[in-house]
Design a protein with these regions (language model features):
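Glycine-rich phosphate-binding/catalytic subdomain of phosphoryl-transfer
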Residues: 57-136
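A generic N-terminal leader/anchor concept
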Residues: 16-19, 53-56, 78
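Non-catalytic pre-domain segments flanking phosphatase-related domains
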Residues: 1-3
């Protein structure tokens, strides 16, 4: 049985999964894409269900490899693109698509902030208010 590290990366446009051995050798890799919706100019959203679906499809593809039965997942590393709030209801069900970092709909609000408010936001969150970043 070969111990492996399974790395799962959720990027802006897709999910990549890499299988690495204890020496750092890449044994296998697979990826799949998911869509972004742009219902209005400047908007950019994704359905969390698409992330889950694509990840499972990519993992299923890797499990079809003939060497898979000889691998034991010893560690799992996961990462994602910057940030995105997944809003849930009281039953932990997703209630709307996730607004992703490329969304620019809040540009007018960011531009309308007075200098003191902008400075306060920076002092508290160490970032300037821009449409790209969620406030802390």
């Amino acid at each position: 049985m070969t111990d492996i590290l399974l790395g799962i990366d959720f990027g802006t446009g897709g999910c990549k999964v890499t299988v690495i051995d204890s020496l750092g050798n890449i044994l296998a890799a697979a990826s799949g894409e998911y869509p972004s919706a742009h219902p209005y100019p400047g908007w950019s959203e994704q359905a969390p269900a698409d992330w889950w679906r694509v990840m499972n499809t990519v993992l299923a593809e890797l499990r079809q490899r003939p060497e898979w039965p000889g691998w034991r997942v010893a560690a799992l590393a996961m990462d994602s693109y910057t940030h995105g709030a997944v809003l849930l209801d009281e039953h932990l069900q997703v209630i709307r698509p996730t607004i992703i970092w490329t969304d620019q709909r809040s540009a007018p609000e960011c531009q309308a902030l007075d200098p003191k408010t902008r400075d306060d936001i920076f002092r508290i969150g160490y970032q300037m208010p821009t449409p790209t970043w969620t406030l802390p």
